[in-house]
């Protein structure tokens, strides 16, 4: 599991909110190098299976983190939702991965919030609670084989 935590910036100083990104399902990364297996067609099949699993898990992680942040920070900051993109930080992770943008440093109100220790603790608790929800879901479904 790979979680990259950032703060956002925009030319529009009114841009606001937190958001969670996952890798676009259409992007296919190579998890298993074809040169490490005898049967190259097997590597293709395994890569496809792993990518499908990683995408499913990444979407769920993004959902649960977004919900965790919403529960603790939604009164003070806009939830921009979960989104997909081929960001470098998630594209090159050979595991389930998400990018969490905690707010906009170019927005005066949010920049001030993100310098407040109590608010930062709320945000970290929101992320933590989302991860607990994901792990609980994962363990109940035994690795999503039941999906």
Language model features with spans:
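Active-site-proximal helix/loop segments of hydrolytic enzymes
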Residues: 1-147
